[in-house]
């Protein structure tokens, strides 16, 4: 509703762990749009369990949602992205990773940090491959933010988490929006293959503690 004043915003539900649903999503967009300027790969999942009892489905669900979906969505949409990109102003793909894919998290969410490290490396690999097609590919690595995925953690450990962040607060939507706008704008036309932490300094604090 907030975006309606800027134009039509269409929701297309899809299970991005399934190739046929990715294809259906692409087909719907392709029928309505001649090109695509920006693709944000933001679907995500996490799973928590202790090491000795971590289940296979907890591994597969997270990897399929966080990694597989990025590769195949980008693959499907690459031709639409090519149509809008130029040498001076490429089209953009923004992948959402995590600082847990850079540093070592405390929580027992084994498939999650592994998947986000994969997202960061996939970002670099695709950036190298698709630069010649006038497509910039970068990633944002958020730290602690208020989100559905973080709700239970914040209920239990919010004060501890805030104290561990050098900026002494939890991230807000405007923090992520600012990073995404930068990576979508002319200001980042000469930037591809980076992973941008948006974490209030959490990573440097972790390294200092080590």
Regions found by a protein language model. Give the residues of each.
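Short, small/polar-rich loop/turn modules that mediate ligand/substrate recognition or access, typified
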Residues: 35, 131, 136, 191-193
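A glycine/serine/threonine-rich, flexible loop-to-helix segment
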Residues: 107-108, 132, 139-165, 175, ...
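Residue(s) in the substrate-gating loop at a strand-loop-helix junction
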Residues: 98
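Substrate-binding pocket helix/loop in short-chain dehydrogenase/reductase
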Residues: 50-51, 55-63, 161
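Alpha-helical segment proximal to the catalytic Tyr-Lys
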Residues: 79, 128-129, 189
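Active-site helix of classical SDR
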Residues: 74, 115, 123
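Short C-terminal tail/terminal secondary-structure segment
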Residues: 181, 192-210
């Amino acid at each position: 509703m907030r975006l309606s004043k800027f134009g039509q915003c269409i929701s297309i539900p899809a299970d991005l762990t399934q190739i046929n649903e990715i294809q259906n999503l692409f087909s719907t967009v392709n029928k309505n749009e001649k090109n695509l300027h920006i693709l944000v790969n933001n679907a995500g999942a996490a799973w928590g369990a202790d090491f000795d009892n971590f289940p296979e489905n907890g591994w597969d669900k997270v990897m399929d949602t966080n990694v597989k979906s990025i590769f195949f969505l980008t693959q499907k949409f690459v031709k639409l992205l090519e149509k809008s990109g130029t040498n001076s102003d490429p089209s953009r793909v923004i992948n959402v990773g995590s600082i847990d894919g850079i540093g070592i998290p405390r929580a027992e969410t084994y498939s999650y940090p592994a998947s986000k490290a994969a997202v960061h490396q996939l970002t670099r690999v695709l950036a190298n491959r698709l630069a010649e097609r006038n497509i910039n590919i970068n990633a944002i690595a958020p730290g602690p933010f208020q989100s559905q995925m973080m709700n239970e953690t914040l209920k239990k450990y919010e004060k501890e988490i805030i104290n561990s962040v050098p900026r002494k607060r939890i991230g807000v939507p405007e923090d992520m929006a600012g990073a995404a706008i930068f990576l979508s704008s002319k200001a980042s036309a000469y930037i591809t293959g980076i992973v941008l932490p948006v974490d209030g300094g959490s990573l440097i604090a972790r390294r200092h503690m080590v």
